[in-house]
């Protein structure tokens, strides 16, 4: 065997390249050829020579022992045995040594002709079908036509045609087949992968590239153009990887054999073997290859050979990718064998199973129990577990102290658990924290560090306050313990991961270690006041006196008393009298002085705020102590108060019967209206549901009122709810109000369930009847099923989010951008959803912010907006602030600190190296799982709110209308609004400042006019909440056109009343569309209305109508039950940038609406701008139009119903609008569930979705049209080409060619040279830069298109990503987190930042000594000019 250099791979590489393997490379990495299909000898269990497990090729099976046993022991290391040829070395080389198989005929690699896009096919310009025919030996392909007539390259021939051709040529040109292959006259046609190999060798990439580029630019047919561009991409990737890739390497002549220990063969008892599938696949290849060798040697007929060659091709195919073939090779029990590709793919593949998720040593797991007496940073660790985890440290100490001499005896002592080890263990554990982790780890607070305390027993003790972060409870949860070993790891655990440092939630900056349950209840109980009890109204000179009085039993803990206390006012400590209670004094003993005196009832919310302010004012250490103190107080007081409840505490209000009676009466009235035919079936349904929702709401209010006054508010059930310890209004309503309306079971999970109109009137205290119970079960079970299914969805969403954003790291302090986002407060109707304060807090301002009234500068440009400044801005008249945002950050890699703003987990500006991408992904993904787990708590109750149907003024002011068209109703005192885009503003009568903005729905009744003054509480407008309507704007006679029974409408008679109604249906005759017209006495048409599908026509043909009368009602969809079950898919839809199922058609310009004629079931609508530009849209008749003729619309206004697609927003309103749209829409889904997540997390993800642009016109750059590239790459390429010239006519120049791109300088030199020689000079034009349009990618696509191929491959579609990367010869620069984890490097973030790698940590004295030596070295005089003194590190 040839001498081989040790090729250990160093682990300090900084990039990885993937290319096609050439046959030479495979041979270079191989240790020998595998010739036989045998694996091991079944009697001796020794590997067969030259077989798949051969020791000569792959190395010895036992450490330092050759096959025949001549050389044993380590002293013969490196010797090759002269008898059996095995090198004496360690057995682990069998994990890294490769072999190879020499194939008799070349074989095409399945990845390159069976995956889409078809690489070999695109290079040769052959369709997949033809390619398969060649590769699987069905057709000959002409490689060089030579003298043959009527044939060209790449023509396919059947066998007969081929043989005929050969005979013909032999007749006309004798000896043609004996010419050299290089002779252009020779006719060459081949079959199988050999033919493909020859063709690929002959491919001239450059000429194909020029030809295709030309075709893409000039071809008129769109299809041929796309085809050319697709082929061009494959050709260009090969050109880009010139020098490392040759096209013919897609056909293999040598196959590598992976090391035997990676495809083990294990003998089981009973003489059977368990083996890896790969061995079977390799065996088939070797058997077929050997058989083919023999057949060729004995000169078998062509037919037999061809069959054998085809079988070899198939064997190799199934070795590389068995799942891609239609006829996969199956094992004995009909299971497809696992090929090489399958072992990379999926959750069980190499990437996800072994590289990204490894099992680690020094870990333990056990059940958790609560440890109420622990401090915030401590956890209880069972003794036995600790002894095992800290074993090496204990052994070292045992030897150091001289208790034992050898490691072996020390091990025995530890294993026997001798008493001497316990105090050593105590000593070793000091300052050596452990990491606790609870699965599923949904966010970074799922792993925290604690200082362990030894405890008896076998369960881990966990601090009760850190349960929220872990989402742990003590009903049998288990947790894992990990031990950090190196000093750096211990330091990081102590300084960054200690539980007492992780008090804030990175998702929203609110404290996450908030007391819950018992603690809250205890604190709430003692801080609640109770009038008229012992000691009410007493006055004390200080807290001490009050405490003494309490201890003496002179004053009750709840009694309102007056006390002098110290309080902070404007930063000063002052003594003042407050009305408070002994309980509140107790709490304030623990509240840090700087926070001031807390004088309120402490519920969960109040506690969260207090903890937040303690952190801001006093820092983390104080907060940790404060938390422990109130935890102890809370537990103690909950115990002292004896706060449990019995059945009598669950009160049922006396008004219940009366309210239910009211409900019945109202429903009866509705049914009567319905049977008289005043209202439609849907209206009846909606009104009934509404009635019961109202009744239920009123009952709840009565109930809560009664509970809160029961026993002076000290009703246990009420206290539990009010403090936020347990239970919600909903649950109490079900306990003692009524269960309310339930959702109907429905078949598909698509649309929200309808609601059963008979409510459940009983509550749980009274007990449900059998029917009620039966109805209830559906909700409960649906909840449980949803939970199980949705957890997986949420987990998958998190995974995609992490994958798309894991390389977003803070890379620099300031990217220097001048752009930002204009931020205002978010309103829905009238309610502020997110205040300006919340949205700008902790962000960086783009400009100086100046107070409009005083003219002071509040915040300078580039400064963080802190709490105080944000509050000033909130209180001032400033409406909008421009803030720096991740969305506008211009860093090439990652984002910059100024654009990100404050790190929510620390409340300070974010530092370089913070992994904001992963934090964003976790913050968004974690509540997804939480929320889906919460669906069943409300038991499927239909929680829809009673619909509003009128607008009351909230202010005194003057009304202003914009774009209002209204008609006076004939016989009433109001107007009816007939315009669609009407805005109503209420302005302050004195200053004219707008107080409120409202949109007025079409068809609403209007009770005031422009400029009227309104008082607070006046009803301005009123509308029908259940129906959209069409109102007559003129008086006249009604006439219908195109309203034909069973073509455009059907009569529906109501089951109960027998009244008939016309309902417009989708027109069966596409030329006909239903219209309603109003005509005057002379038969002139005054107004024309088109009737949408599903409309109920209220009037009949020939009826006289008055102004403002309703002609048509279009029922709005029925009340749906809400669950985040609707929410999660919505979030996914937004992040994947999917188009909704029925998208709205949107106007692209501002303009006036005109109606055109009908075309094939579509109505044509034109929008004409003021400048006369016209756009036409075709809208299906089945869709409801949202605009009327002559309406004025703005760009981006939907013309038909449906959701607007993000792509439309991007195209019409630009990137900023679509970014804001996605962020706000996703936020809405989470807000609906009451989950707070900071905007910046969504911005990080949306930034990643908008990284890429699509090339519209490549100009003279290297890009292709329709190619998708990174924004920054386009900018760089355009900068590179800027100012350069393109040669049009090379003149007499020897150097330049036409089409070449040159710098102006080179051109000047060349032309001046030509001028001197009086030759023709070079003509040029300016180089054209590329133009590109921004595109929006879904997170899955964005993740698959990251720069790093390793990150993409480990995410999804592994084989596709890898084979495309290999063709391009891609280099992975290991910039993200995943790639580095896969390579086993430290991640380039946090403490692993590449800048810190070169840091040398030394003692100060050593450092000064070293610099002094360096200085003296540098100051030695030399002949050369003195060196500049290097700045000291």
From Swiss-Prot:
InterPro entries to which the protein is assigned, alphabetical: DNA-dir_RpoC_beta_prime, DNA-dir_RpoC_beta_prime_bact, RNA_pol_asu, RNA_pol_N, RNA_pol_Rpb1_1, RNA_pol_Rpb1_3, RNA_pol_Rpb1_3_sf, RNA_pol_Rpb1_4
CDD domains registered for this protein in UniProt: RNAP_beta'_C, RNAP_beta'_N
NCBIfam families linked to this entry: rpoC_TIGR
Family of the protein in this entry: Belongs to the RNA polymerase beta' chain family.
Entry protein name: DNA-directed RNA polymerase subunit beta'
Positions of Zn(2+) 2 binding: 815, 889, 896, 899
Organism: Porphyromonas gingivalis (strain ATCC 33277 / DSM 20709 / CIP 103683 / JCM 12257 / NCTC 11834 / 2561)
Subunit structure: The RNAP catalytic core consists of 2 alpha, 1 beta, 1 beta' and 1 omega subunit. When a sigma factor is associated with the core the holoenzyme is formed, which can initiate transcription.
Binding residues for Zn(2+) 1: 66, 68, 81, 84
Record's keyword annotation contains Nucleotidyltransferase: yes
Matching PANTHER family: DNA-DIRECTED RNA POLYMERASE, DNA-DIRECTED RNA POLYMERASE SUBUNIT BETA
One Pfam family here: RNA_pol_Rpb1_5
């Amino acid at each position: 065997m040839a001498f081989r250099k040790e090729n250990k791979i160093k682990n300090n590489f900084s990039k990885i390249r993937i290319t096609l393997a050439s046959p030479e490379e495979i041979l270079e990495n191989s240790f020998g050829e595998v010739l036989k299909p045998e694996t091991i000898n079944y009697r001796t269990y020794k590997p067969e020579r030259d077989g798949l497990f051969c020791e000569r090729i792959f190395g010895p099976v036992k450490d330092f022992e050759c096959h025949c046993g001549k050389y044993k022991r380590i002293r013969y290391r490196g010797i090759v045995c002269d008898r059996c040829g095995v090198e004496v070395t360690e057995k682990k080389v069998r994990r890294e040594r490769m072999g190879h198989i020499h194939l008799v005929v070349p074989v095409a690699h399945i990845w390159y002709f069976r995956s889409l896009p078809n690489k070999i096919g695109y290079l040769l310009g052959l369709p997949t079908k033809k390619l398969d025919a060649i590769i699987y030996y069905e057709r000959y392909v002409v490689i060089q036509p030579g003298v043959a007539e009527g044939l060209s390259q790449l023509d396919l021939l059947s066998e007969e045609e081929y043989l005929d051709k050969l005979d013909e040529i032999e007749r006309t040109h004798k000896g043609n087949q004996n010419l050299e292959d290089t002779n252009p006259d020779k006719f060459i046609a081949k079959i199988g992968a050999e033919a493909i190999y020859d063709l690929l060798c002959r491919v001239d990439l450059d000429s194909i590239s020029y030809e295709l580029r030309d075709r893409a630019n000039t071809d008129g047919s769109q299809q041929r153009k796309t085809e050319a561009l697709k082929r061009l991409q494959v050709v260009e990737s090969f050109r880009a990887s010139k020098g490392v890739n040759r096209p013919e390497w897609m056909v293999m002549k040598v196959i590598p054999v992976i090391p035997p220990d990676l495809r083990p063969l294990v003998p089981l008892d009973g003489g059977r073997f368990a083996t890896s599938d790969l061995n079977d696949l390799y065996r088939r290849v070797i058997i077929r290859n050997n058989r083919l060798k023999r057949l060729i040697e004995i000169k078998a007929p062509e037919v037999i050979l061809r069959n054998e060659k085809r079988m070899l091709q198939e064997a190799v195919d199934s070795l590389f990718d068995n799942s891609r073939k239609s006829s996969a090779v199956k094992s004995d029990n009909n299971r497809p064998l696992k090929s090489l590709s399958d072992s990379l793919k999926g959750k069980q593949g190499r990437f996800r199973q072994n590289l990204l998720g490894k099992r680690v040593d020094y870990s333990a797991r056990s059940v958790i129990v609560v440890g109420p007496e622990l401090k915030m940073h401590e956890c209880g660790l069972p003794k036995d577990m600790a002894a095992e985890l800290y074993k090496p440290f204990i052994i070292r100490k045992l030897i150091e102290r001289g208790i034992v001499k050898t490691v072996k005896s020390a091990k025995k002592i530890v294993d026997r658990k001798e008493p001497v080890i316990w105090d050593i263990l105590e000593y070793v554990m000091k300052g050596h924290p452990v990491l606790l982790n609870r699965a599923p780890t949904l966010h970074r607070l799922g792993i925290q560090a604690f200082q362990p305390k030894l405890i008896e027993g076998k369960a881990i003790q966990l601090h009760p306050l850190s349960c929220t972060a872990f989402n742990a409870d003590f009903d049998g949860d288990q947790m894992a313990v990990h031990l950090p070993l190196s000093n750096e790891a211990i330091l990081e655990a102590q300084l960054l991961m200690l539980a007492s440092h992780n008090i804030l939630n990175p998702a929203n900056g609110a404290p996450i270690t908030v007391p819950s349950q018992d603690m809250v209840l205890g604190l709430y109980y003692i801080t609640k006041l109770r009038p008229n009890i012992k000691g009410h109204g007493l006055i004390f000179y200080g807290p001490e006196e009050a405490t003494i009085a309490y201890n003496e039993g002179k004053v009750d803990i709840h009694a309102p008393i007056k006390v002098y206390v110290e309080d902070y006012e404007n930063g000063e400590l002052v003594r003042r009298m407050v009305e408070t209670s002994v309980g509140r004094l107790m709490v304030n003993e623990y509240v840090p002085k700087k926070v001031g005196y807390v004088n309120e009832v402490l519920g969960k919310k109040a506690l969260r705020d207090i903890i937040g302010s303690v952190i801001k004012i006093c820092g983390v250490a104080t907060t940790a102590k404060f938390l422990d103190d109130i935890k102890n107080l809370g537990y103690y007081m909950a115990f002292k108060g004896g706060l449990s409840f019995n059945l009598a505490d669950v009160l049922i209000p006396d008004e219940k019967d009366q309210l239910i009676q009211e409900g019945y009466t109202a429903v009866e009235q509705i049914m009567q209206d319905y049977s008289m035919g005043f209202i439609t079936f849907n209206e009846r349904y909606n009104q009934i549901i509404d009635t019961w929702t109202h009744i239920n709401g009123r009952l709840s209010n009565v109930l809560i009122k009664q509970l809160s006054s029961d026993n002076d508010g000290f009703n246990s059930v009420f206290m539990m709810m009010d403090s936020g310890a347990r239970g919600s209004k909903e649950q109490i309503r079900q306990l003692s109000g009524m269960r309310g309306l339930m959702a109907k079971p429905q078949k598909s999970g698509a649309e929200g369930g309808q609601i059963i109109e008979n409510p459940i009137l009983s509550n749980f205290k009274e007990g449900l009847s059998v029917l009620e119970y039966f109805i209830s079960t559906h909700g409960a079970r649906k909840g449980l099923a949803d939970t199980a299914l949705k957890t997986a969805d949420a987990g998958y969403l998190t995974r995609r989010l992490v994958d798309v954003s894991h390389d977003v790291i803070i890379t620099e302090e300031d990217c220097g951008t001048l752009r930002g986002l204009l931020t205002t407060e978010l309103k829905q109707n009238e309610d502020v959803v997110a205040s300006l304060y919340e949205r700008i807090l902790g962000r960086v301002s783009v400009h100086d912010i100046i107070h409009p009234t005083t003219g002071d500068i509040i915040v300078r440009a580039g400064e963080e907006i802190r709490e105080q400044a944000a509050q000033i801005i909130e209180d001032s008249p400033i409406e909008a602030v421009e803030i720096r945002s991740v969305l506008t950050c211009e860093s090439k890699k990652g984002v910059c600190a100024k654009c990100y703003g404050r790190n929510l987990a620390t409340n300070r500006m974010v530092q370089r190296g913070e992994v904001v991408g992963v934090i964003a992904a976790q913050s968004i993904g974690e509540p997804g799982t939480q929320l889906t787990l919460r669906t069943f708590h409300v038991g499927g109750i239909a929680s829809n709110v009673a619909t509003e149907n009128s607008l009351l003024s909230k202010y005194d002011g003057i009304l202003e209308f914009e774009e209002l068209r209204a008609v006076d109703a004939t016989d009433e005192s109001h107007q009816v609004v007939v315009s669609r885009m009407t805005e109503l503003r209420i302005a302050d009568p004195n200053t004219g400042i707008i107080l409120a903005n409202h949109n007025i729905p079409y068809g609403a009744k209007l009770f005031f006019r422009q400029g009227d003054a309104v008082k607070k509480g006046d009803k301005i407008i009123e509308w029908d909440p259940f129906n959209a309507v069409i109102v007559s704007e003129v008086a006249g006679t009604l006439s219908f056109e195109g309203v034909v029974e069973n073509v455009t409408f059907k009569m529906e008679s109501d089951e109960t009343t027998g009244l008939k109604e016309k309902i417009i249906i989708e027109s069966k005759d596409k030329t006909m569309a239903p219209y309603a017209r109003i005509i005057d006495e002379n038969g002139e048409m005054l107004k024309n209305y088109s009737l949408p599908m599903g409309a109920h026509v209220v009037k009949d043909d020939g009826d006289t109508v008055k102004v403002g009368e309703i002609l048509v009602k279009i029922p709005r969809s029925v009340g749906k039950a809400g669950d985040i079950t609707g929410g999660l898919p919505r979030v996914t839809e937004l992040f994947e940038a999917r188009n909704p199922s029925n998208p709205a058609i949107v106007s692209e310009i501002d303009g006036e609406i005109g109606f055109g004629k009908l075309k094939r079931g579509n109505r044509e609508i034109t929008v004409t701008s003021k400048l006369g530009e016209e756009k036409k849209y075709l809208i299906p008749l089945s869709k409801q139009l949202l605009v009327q003729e002559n309406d004025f619309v703005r760009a981006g206004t939907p013309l038909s119903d449906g959701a607007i697609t993000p792509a439309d927003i991007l195209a019409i309103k630009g990137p900023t609008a679509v970014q804001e749209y996605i962020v706000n829409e996703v936020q809405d889904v989470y807000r609906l569930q009451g989950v707070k997540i900071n905007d910046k997390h969504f911005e990080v993800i949306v930034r990643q979705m908008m990284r890429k642009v699509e090339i519209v016109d490549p100009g003279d750059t290297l890009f292709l049209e329709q190619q998708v590239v990174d924004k920054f790459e386009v900018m760089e390429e355009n900068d590179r080409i800027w100012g350069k010239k393109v040669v049009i006519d090379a003149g007499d120049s020897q150097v330049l060619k036409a089409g070449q791109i040159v710098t102006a300088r080179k051109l000047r030199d060349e032309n001046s040279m030509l001028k001197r020689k009086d030759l023709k000079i070079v003509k040029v034009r300016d180089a054209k830069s590329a133009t590109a349009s921004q595109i929006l990618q879904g997170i899955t696509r964005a993740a698959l298109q990251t720069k790093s191929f390793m990150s993409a491959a480990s995410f999804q579609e592994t084989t596709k990503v890898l084979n495309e990367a290999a063709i391009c010869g891609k280099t992975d620069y290991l910039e993200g987190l995943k790639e580095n984890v896969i390579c086993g490097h430290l991640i380039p973030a946090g403490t692993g930042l590449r800048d810190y790698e070169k840091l040398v940590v030394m003692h100060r004295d050593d450092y000064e000594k070293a610099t002094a030596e360096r200085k003296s070295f540098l100051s030695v005089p030399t002949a050369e000019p003195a060196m500049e003194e290097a700045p000291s590190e």
